Amino acid sequence: MKSTLIAFSCFLFPTAIVLAQPKVENLGNAINSEYNEINPVISPDGKTLYFGRVSHPQNAHGQEGSQDIWFSEWQNSQWSLAKRMTPPLNKEEYNCAYSVTPDGNTLLIMGAYDRGAYETRGFSFSKRTVNGWSAPSKLNIPGLEGMSKGEYMCGFLSNDGKTLLMAFSEKKRSTKDDLYVSFLQKNGTWTKPQSLGVEVNTDDFTETTPFLASDGATIYFSSDRPGGQGSNDIYYTKRIDKTWKRWSKPANLGPAINTDGYDAYYAIAAAGDYAYMVSKKNTLGKGDIVRIKIKSDEPSAAPIVPAPDPVALVSGKVVDTKTGKPIDARIIYENLADGTEVGTAQTDPRTGEYKIVLPKGVKYGVRAVAKDFIAEAQSIDLTNMKGGFQEVNGTNLTLVPIEINAVGVLNNLFFDTGKAALRPESNAELDRMVLTFNENPGLVMEIGGHTDNVGTDAANLKLSQERADSVREYFIGKGIEPDRVQSKGYGEAKPKATNDTEEGRQTNRRVEFKILKK
């Protein structure tokens, strides 16, 4: 039976999911207790679990129906003892985390807050700082307050931070929610929510607790539509195009996941190996959080339930090229084919570490952005990514301080072999440097071309000069004054690595910038 105990705008499910095969694992007393654990939110790297705990004596409002956000971390092959999140979070009677970004530094939480003070229903971000989590700050979503008239509301933020899924009803006091989407705009506001359409939403039944998989295209949600195993089942649908209006027919995940009870809040990490849910069966108290093995350890085996497209989890660190120290920076990743920004992330302000999730099939440029620095971008090519989920570790990003004689590499420049003409996928890197020139009107640079030692000295010197000239001409064509950009070819005279290996030769084939004035 579905419980009627409801958080202010986040579901409480004391009567939760009864999970069947295969391999259901109760997460144990480090996470579960005699109280009700609900609404699991797993970080994309699978290492942090946020969840709600109901009526616990440590909750901000004690044991009378309160709900606070708790978390546990995966350490030494086990979950750590769960801790309650401290102020400025968990100040209200009912608190809920909906999702966390891949970098682990931004939480999407229930309620619209202004400088930490609750205003109304909606959504807010809390961001990690060197001193802990920030006071929550509301997302500006035009039309949401007037559209959301039902009893419930919940949401989910995409891994790239640009898409917000929401479940709510436009009918007053209705419990039959539909799914909506809103998109982040360049000015920091969000678009008016738009319905996912009749292929997903129904008139007489509910669609709720959306979870957008790491591929950015597969949505899992809960619905009480006919044909399910119980009162509510988990369904999935896949986006067909970029309009967010065309979807595959929603399919039930079947008895491997769904039960004869109320099934909701389905969540999976980027690796796609486990699903996290809530169970009422064989629990330590009321509802417990469990995980279900949904991907076989055998690579050739079919998944137990339909899986999203594989992705890569990319991690690294942002450091100052001069000092080697970590930097608190914004991460931007873009499609090198057309220069479009795919998503953003934030480094851990304490360590400079970052994590992003990248869908396969694209060649990406990744860079860090911080005041008074110029980025050395990196490229990550997933166009021919084979197999399933991959981890790409050690993709460190460097920032060059804007100081006289500082030198950096323009990594995402592309030329055909032996040619000096810039290929179109170089534009994003070059446009970024144009922006740096415009933001620093006193900046003067030398663009230096370098080659490996294949070929004659004269040919390499000529090619390096022509490539440096091509970059200079691009900048001038974008409005940068000619006397602010010099170009010089060095040929093979200044190698950074050995020329005895292909990897070393590739490192030596480069275009650098050197700051002459600032």
Where are these regions (language model features)?
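Short, acidic Ser/Thr/Gly-rich low-complexity loop/linker segments typical of extracellular
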Residues: A337-E353
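A short, solvent-exposed beta-strand micro-motif common in secreted/extracellular proteins
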Residues: G352, V362-D372
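Short, ordered, surface-exposed loop/turn motifs in non-cytosolic proteins
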Residues: K176, T321-A337
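A short, amphipathic beta-strand motif
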Residues: A312-T321, I331, G352, L397
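Short, conserved micro-motifs composed of acidic
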Residues: Q21-S315, V392
